[in-house]
């Protein structure tokens, strides 16, 4: 299924019972809904628990449009895509689970449109994320040399999937980003769960992020890094318990 989000065609999927509580799932950078949430059995887990899953392919990813202009990937625009999807479906609000880039998008939705989201799970996110090496990642996506291991990891991950447009991904990582603002984070009132692998060396200072959000609690998944935390049983169990309130 598709909808128009401020002139950009975005792909989304619906799964689970029509009567289920809606949960929007937003994937990480260079991934897409199916890779992030289906192969890792998140869709199966959530629909099995009775939720109505709304899976979005972010702009520049999956089956959605892939602009090559970094301005098209401003964080506020990508957060706006979530709000416009909720409007398109006429559901008012939804729970939210995002990973890595998807978590950063969810955090921005909390700041810009807090009434669109209910309970929010932010996975693979910290104070910095990968954006401090954005220029290196963009160079890697364009096949240019880089000494950044993080950039090389993302490049190898991205190029393994033919659906990816590496120039669009370079533009995405260079899109305008709003820095973390402790004052704004302190205004969040939605319940928030932050989940990271305890071996994640990409996200930065997760404790600083959690301490800045009054409603946040933190779960660390033992033995998992940024790439391996998504399918972890402990992550799913923590999310289900949290969403149930």
Predicted features by range, described:
Residues 92-130:
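Conserved hydrolase catalytic core segment
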Residues 38, 44-48, 55-95:
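Active-site loop/oxyanion-hole signature of alpha/beta-hydrolase fold enzymes
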Residues 8-65:
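Conserved HGGG/HGGXW glycine-rich cap/lid loop of the alpha/beta-hydrolase fold
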Residues 188, 194-196:
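Short beta-strand/loop motif that positions the catalytic acidic residue
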Residues 210-227:
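Catalytic histidine neighborhood in serine/cysteine hydrolases
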Residues 156-181:
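Hydrophobic, aromatic-rich cap/lid helix
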Residues 224-236:
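Catalytic histidine-centered segment of alpha/beta-hydrolase-like enzymes
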Residues 201-207:
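Conserved alpha/beta-hydrolase "acid-adjacent" motif
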């Amino acid at each position: 299924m598709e909808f128009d989000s401020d002139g950009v065609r975005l792909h989304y999927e619906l799964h689970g019972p029509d009567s289920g509580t809606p949960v929007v799932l937003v994937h990480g950078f260079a991934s897409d809904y199916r890779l992030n949430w289906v192969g890792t059995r998140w869709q199966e887990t959530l629909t099995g628990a009775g939720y109505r899953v709304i899976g979005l392919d972010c702009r520049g990813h999956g089956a959605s449009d892939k602009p090559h202009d970094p301005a098209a990937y401003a964080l506020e625009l990508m957060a706006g895509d979530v709000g416009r999807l909720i409007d398109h479906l006429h559901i008012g609000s939804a729970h939210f689970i995002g990973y890595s880039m998807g978590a950063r998008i969810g955090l921005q939705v909390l700041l810009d449109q807090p009434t669109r989201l209910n309970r929010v799970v932010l996975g693979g996110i910290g104070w910095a994320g990968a954006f401090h090496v954005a220029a290196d990642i963009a160079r890697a996506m364009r096949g240019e040399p880089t000494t950044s291991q993080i950039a090389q990891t993302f490049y190898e991950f991205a190029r393994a999937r033919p659906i990816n447009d590496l120039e669009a991904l370079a533009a995405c990582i260079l899109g305008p980003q709003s820095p973390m603002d402790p004052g704004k984070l302190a205004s969040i009132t939605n319940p928030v769960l932050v989940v990271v692998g305890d071996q994640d060396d990409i996200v930065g200072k997760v404790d600083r992020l959690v301490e800045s959000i009054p409603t946040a609690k933190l779960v660390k998944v033992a033995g998992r890094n940024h790439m391996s935390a998504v399918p972890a049983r402990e992550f799913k169990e923590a999310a289900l318990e949290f969403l149930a309130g």
